[in-house]
Each structure stands twice: as structure tokens, then as C-alpha cells.
């Protein structure tokens, strides 16, 4: 049995490792969802509104129950529909025969316009197209253009302008369904939008205006550089140097930015310089001057050290400004995210994903798998270090005798050397009699 303090510490470490694994799993699932959404077909935002209108078959339920027509209205609507169908048949027969005059047509149109609340049934003979209606029914406040009814197809009432087109319009292939086909033809369903994939049509995406402007400037500058004749003359070399300086000035400012590696190297040099300055200052302060000349030399040395310290502080401020301009970098595995030596020791709560450069999807898959494998190995190494710090003192403090000590050694060897996967088995041979 392990001591209580050791057990609590080990349980806390294991719980922290499990929490880190769960958080890593959530991050991987989120990244996987984003990748799948990018690799699937993209639906353009402009085509979402272009949906076909619901037809007579799909419009089974009325979205406005308060506007449901009464049976009397439905009956009057049926009479009007029959009258319009008869008028269409009469018009088709008159057009085929060629016996229609324009004056009766205008007269019938004026009759239809003046009697806005009545509907006429056409005469029985084609020659009497301009006659009065034989059967009229009042329309009691019918205001809906389209009225769905059970057992009847959806029909649309014609306004005064539509009635004029019935009197003067072109032919229709069918008397009943022709009107509905003509009215539904303009609102036909558009074709389905073509699938947009990032692999095939990613080059069609447009960058923001600032990026496009910078890219055009960069391409024009490189075009000028490539057009410059390559020669060994000093004028051409000076012109190229001046041109590259102009490119750096136009792209990133008067001075090039320091990279993260350069910042780390410079910070290391500053640390070494600070340690040397500290040692030199201790030596000067600990030495007791024998005369005024030694004291004067000591003061001069301290003034020089103070000037060097000021230069180091100024350089440190420049490095901090360079780090502040750079985007945040991902924290290495095994290092607490609260402080990073590459960032000057400042705390950064959120880390951006690491930028991967790859040439194929297989290479990207290999990079991701190796990155996960390295993270797992780092976690295992950290846990083994914790186990070594907790278990080795117990083994060294125990008395090397008896089965309990052997069992403890086997358990420690299994945890530290085998990763807990295998346990050694000790065989004892009985002495021969």
C-alpha cells in the first residue's frame, strides 16, 4: 500500500492527464467538423432563397385558417371557373374559324369591365360571341386570388386585365388546365445550384481588398525585379539592393520584423549578458579599494556597467515590442500555457493553432498523426517522471527482504520500465533433497 500523501498526488496527476486528454479530444472533434464542412460541397448563400413555390399537391393545409372560404364562395368559384372555361373554348373556335370581328370583342370586354361583381356564361353558338350573359351569380366579396379546396385543384381568379386577355389572348392547348399551366409557367422551379467544392472551385473565392492590394503590389514589384537585367556591374547590384529595400519598406515598414527564433536567440544573449554584468558588479562591490585611484577606477567600472545595463534594457523593450506585433504562437506540449520564454514570460490565455505547410493530403495526415504521437509520448514521459519521484524513495526506504519487497520492486519495474503493460513473474525452484 502506498502512503496517503503519495496516493493523493498520483491520483491528482492521473486526473489531470485524463482531463487534458478529454480537452484534446474535444479540440480534435471540433477541428474534424470544420475540416468536413470545408471539404463538403458548399451551398452559395444566394441560392437559398431560390426555392420552387409550393404546387397544388404540396399545399394541402391552409396557413391562414381565418381565411377559409365558405361553401357558398366555393360554389360561386366553381361557376365562375366553368364560365371561363366555356369562354376559352368559344374563343378558340372563333379564332380557328376566322369569323370574329374586333368590335364585338371590344363590346364584350366593356361589358366584363362594367359588371365587376357579376360573371357571364358564354352563349351556346359561336356566332353570338358578343351577346349578354345567360346566367349570372353574384360574388360575395371574394378577395382571394387563390383558394384551395378539398377535391378541387387550385385555381386562380382572373382580374379585369386577365379577362381582357381571355377575350383577346392566344390559343391554349387545353381548356381547363391551360390557364393554370400558363399562370404557373413563370414561377417554375429553378435548376438546382451546382455543388461548390473547395478543391475544385477554391480559386474562385475572392480575398479581401487589403489582401488583393498587397498581392498586386508584391506581384508588380517581383515583375519589375525579374525584368531587371542580370549583370555583374556595380550599378545593377546597387539597383537590386535599393529595390529590395523598397520592397521591404512597402510591405512591412522601415525595418524588417524579427522572427520568433531571432527573438529567442536575442533573449538568450541578453540573459547571458545580464548574468555576466551581475557577477562583475558583485566583484566590484565586494572589493575594498586601498587608495583613491582604485576607488576612482571602481566608480568608472560601475558607470560603464550601468551604461551597459541601460543598453540591455533598451534592447529588451525592443524585443517586447517585436513580440507584441507578432501573432501568438502555440504553447509547446508539456509547458504550462501561463508563461512562455519565447514570449518574454508574459501570460497568454489562448493559443492559435500551429501553421502547417504541406504539399499533399497524405503529408498532412502524416504530420497530424506524428504530432498526436509526440503529444502522447510527452504525456507518458511526464507521468513516468512523477512516478519515479514518488516510488523510488519508497523502494530505497523499504527493507530488501521478504515477498512484499519483491512485489514492490516488480510493480515499480512494471510502471517505470514497461509502462504498466507487463508485469515480471518470478519463478522459484524448490531445492533438491
Swiss-Prot record:
Biased composition (Pro residues): 327-339
InterPro entries cross-referenced by the UniProt entry: DUF4693
GO cellular component, as recorded: centriole; cilium; cytoplasm
Location in or out of the cell: Cell projection, Cilium; Cytoplasm, Cytoskeleton, Microtubule organizing center, Centrosome, Centriole
Source taxon at top rank: Eukaryota
Region (Disordered): 45-69, 95-169, 326-345
GO biological process: one example: positive regulation of smoothened signaling pathway
One of the Pfam families matching this protein, by short name: DUF4693
Phosphoserine modified-residue sites: 159
Biased composition (Polar residues): 107-120
Keywords assigned by UniProt, alphabetized: Cell projection, Cytoplasm, Cytoskeleton, Phosphoprotein
S-S bridge residues: none
Principal subcellular localisation of the protein: other
Task performed by this protein: Acts as a positive regulator of ciliary hedgehog signaling. Required for centriole stability.
Complex formation: Interacts with TEDC1. Found in a complex with TEDC1, TEDC2, TUBE1 and TUBD1.
The protein, known as: Tubulin epsilon and delta complex protein 2
Organism: Homo sapiens (Human)
Amino acid at each position: 500500500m502506498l502512503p496517503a500523501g503519495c496516493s493523493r498526488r498520483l491520483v491528482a496527476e492521473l486526473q489531470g492527464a485524463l482531463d487534458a486528454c478529454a480537452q484534446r479530444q474535444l479540440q480534435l472533434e471540433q477541428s474534424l467538423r470544420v475540416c468536413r464542412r470545408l471539404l463538403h460541397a458548399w451551398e452559395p448563400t444566394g441560392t437559398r432563397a431560390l426555392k420552387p413555390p409550393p404546387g397544388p399537391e404540396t399545399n394541402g393545409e391552409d396557413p391562414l385558417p381565418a381565411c377559409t372560404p365558405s361553401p357558398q364562395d366555393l360554389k360561386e368559384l366553381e361557376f365562375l371557373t366553368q364560365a371561363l372555361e366555356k369562354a376559352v373554348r368559344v374563343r378558340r373556335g372563333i379564332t380557328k374559324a376566322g369569323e370574329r370581328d374586333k368590335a364585338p370583342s371590344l363590346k364584350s370586354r366593356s361589358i366584363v369591365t362594367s359588371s365587376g361583381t357579376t360573371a357571364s356564361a358564354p352563349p351556346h353558338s359561336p356566332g353570338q360571341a358578343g351577346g349578354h350573359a345567360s346566367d349570372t351569380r353574384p360574388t360575395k366579396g371574394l378577395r382571394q386570388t387563390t383558394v384551395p379546396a378539398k377535391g378541387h385543384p387550385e385555381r386562380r381568379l382572373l382580374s379585369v386585365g386577365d379577362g381582357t386577355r381571355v377575350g383577346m389572348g392566344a390559343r391554349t392547348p387545353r381548356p381547363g388546365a391551360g390557364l393554370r399551366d400558363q399562370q404557373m409557367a413563370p414561377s417554375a422551379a429553378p435548376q438546382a445550384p451546382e455543388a461548390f467544392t473547395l478543391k475544385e472551385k477554391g480559386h474562385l473565392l475572392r480575398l479581401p481588398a487589403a489582401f488583393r492590394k498587397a498581392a498586386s503590389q508584391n506581384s508588380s514589384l517581383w515583375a519589375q525585379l525579374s525584368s531587371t537585367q542580370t549583370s555583374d556591374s556595380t550599378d545593377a547590384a546597387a539597383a537590386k539592393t535599393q529595390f529590395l529595400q523598397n520592397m521591404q519598406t512597402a510591405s512591412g515598414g522601415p525595418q524588417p520584423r524579427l522572427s520568433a527564433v531571432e527573438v529567442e536567440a536575442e533573449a538568450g544573449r541578453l540573459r547571458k549578458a545580464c548574468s555576466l554584468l551581475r557577477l562583475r558588479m558583485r566583484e566590484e562591490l565586494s572589493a575594498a579599494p586601498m587608495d583613491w585611484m582604485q576607488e576612482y577606477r571602481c566608480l568608472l567600472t560601475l558607470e560603464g556597467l550601468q551604461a551597459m545595463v541601460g543598453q540591455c534594457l533598451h534592447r529588451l523593450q525592443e524585443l517586447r515590442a517585436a513580440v507584441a506585433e507578432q501573432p501568438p504562437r502555440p504553447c509547446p506540449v508539456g509547458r504550462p500555457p501561463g508563461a512562455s520564454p519565447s514570449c518574454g514570460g508574459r501570460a497568454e490565455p489562448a493559443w492559435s493553432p500551429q501553421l502547417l505547410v504541406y504539399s499533399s493530403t497524405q503529408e498532412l495526415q502524416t504530420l497530424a498523426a506524428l504530432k498526436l504521437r509526440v503529444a502522447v509520448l510527452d504525456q507518458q514521459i511526464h507521468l513516468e517522471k512523477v512516478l519515479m519521484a514518488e516510488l523510488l524513495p519508497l523502494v530505497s526506504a523499504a527493507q530488501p527482504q521478504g515477498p512484499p519487497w519483491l512485489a514492490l520492486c516488480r510493480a515499480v519495474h512494471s510502471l517505470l520500465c514497461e509502462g504498466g503493460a507487463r508485469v515480471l513473474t518470478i519463478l522459484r525452484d524448490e531445492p533438491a533433497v
